[in-house]
């Protein structure tokens, strides 16, 4: 396996200007050679059609694999221990598995995300949202109208508490889960900090699993524990990774969805008015948010199984590949006025939850959380408005997900 030519661009590990970066990269085409943290080269897929082609299921003749054994740099020893993205590629579970093993692992967790199970979670999510809004009201009254960070107080707590309820996370472990999930997405922190927080997260997951073995409940973790060993793939190691993946996939990305939808509506008051008047659906807002502000950012990692041509680029066997879901959502070859937020547009196509074999299993849960949280927020606070110039609100750290570092707002008038 050989590595392709040196990268033309450096992928900013802080992710501070993701949209500007995408436009600079796109000048070189839909497939761009970049340098990841630590100097490791990779391709970034920016084109919608190229991403769909790359992510197609090809059981007999795959172009790419999730198996790190196909990465030339890793096999050659050029990836140091502690490299910040390594944890996205080496853990044994759904995220890194190829068919047919991926199907077995996906089927293990799938019962937690059936329409009936998701429907049963609806009242739990409604209560979580109502409680967060009450906490915000109390905090706002105590702060005498000062600026509130809606991301910290609402956008992120709703999904992490929902995931906690789904998995049965004990209260005493919730803080460790939160810090560990944050570390996985922050590509700007030091490797030592990332490893420490990630290690603490894995330890907390093991503790939770041990408790469920001793005293199972009515949650996803308990269901997985009860079926350990029923298939060769259903091992304790894979169970731990399935729990970790559920936390990772369901936490910050869903928080970013709520964050970006609020930001989009507050910066496009004409569309907010249309939603409030019932002229535009919350489903349309959510789909357009997922296209306009892809919440998954640059998702690592896939590896070329063989040499192939895509989007004018010559991919070599062993090359690493990231998919820019922000870039695919703003592909001008696919979307008219791609940079415009417009929930009335005719097409709702987006790759916000991926495509193909690894399409997000928890997508219906994420959509439900947003559909509960957004109308409840705007109904409770009809005077909600941004407290800073939108252009000065920074992005969240790292290039893996796409949200804001903070979402400063004035809550305005409260509706009882």
Indicate residue ranges for each PLM-predicted region.
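Cytochrome P450
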Residues: 1-416
């Amino acid at each position: 396996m050989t590595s392709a030519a040196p990268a033309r661009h450096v992928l900013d590990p802080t992710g501070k200007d993701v949209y500007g970066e995408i436009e600079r990269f796109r000048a070189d085409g839909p497939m761009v050679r970049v340098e990841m943290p630590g100097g490791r080269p990779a391709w970034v897929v920016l084109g919608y059609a190229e991403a769909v082609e790359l992510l197609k299921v090809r059981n007999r003749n795959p172009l790419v694999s999730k198996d790190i054994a196909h990465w030339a740099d890793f096999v050659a020893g050029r990836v140091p221990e502690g490299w910040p993205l390594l944890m996205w590629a080496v853990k044994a579970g759904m995220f890194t598995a190829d068919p047919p093993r991926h199907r077995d692992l996906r089927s293990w967790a799938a019962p937690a995300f059936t329409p009936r199970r998701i429907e049963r979670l609806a009242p739990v999510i409604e209560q979580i949202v109502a409680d967060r809004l009450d906490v915000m009201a109390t905090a706002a009254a105590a702060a005498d109208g000062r600026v509130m960070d809606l991301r910290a107080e609402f956008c992120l707590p709703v999904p992490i508490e929902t995931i906690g309820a789904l998995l049965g996370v004990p209260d005493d472990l919730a803080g460790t889960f939160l810090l560990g999930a944050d570390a996985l997405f922050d590509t700007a922190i030091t490797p030592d900090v990332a490893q420490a927080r990630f290690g603490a997260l894995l330890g907390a997951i093991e503790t939770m699993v041990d408790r469920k073995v001793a005293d199972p409940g009515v949650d996803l973790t308990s269901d997985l524990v009860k079926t350990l060993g029923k298939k060769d793939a259903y091992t304790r190691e894979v169970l731990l990774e399935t729990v970790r993946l559920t936390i990772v996939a369901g936490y910050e990305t869903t928080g970013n969805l709520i964050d970006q939808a609020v930001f989009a509506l507050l910066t496009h008051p004409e569309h907010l008015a249309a939603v409030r008047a019932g002229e535009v659906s919350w489903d349309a807002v959510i789909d357009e948010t997922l296209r306009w502000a892809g919440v998954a950012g640059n998702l690592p990692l896939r590896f070329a199984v063989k040499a192939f041509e895509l989007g004018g680029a010559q991919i070599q066997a062993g090359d690493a590949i990231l998919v820019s879901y922000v870039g695919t959502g703003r592909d001008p070859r696919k979307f008219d006025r791609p940079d415009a937020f417009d929930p009335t547009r005719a097409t709702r196509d987006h790759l916000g939850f991926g495509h193909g074999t690894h399409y997000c299993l928890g997508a219906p849960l994420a959509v439900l959380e947003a559909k509960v949280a957004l109308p409840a927020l705007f109904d409770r606070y009809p005077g909600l408005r941004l407290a800073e110039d939108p252009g000065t609100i920074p992005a969240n750290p790292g290039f893996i997900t796409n949200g804001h570092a903070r979402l400063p707002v004035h809550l305005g008038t409260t509706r009882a």
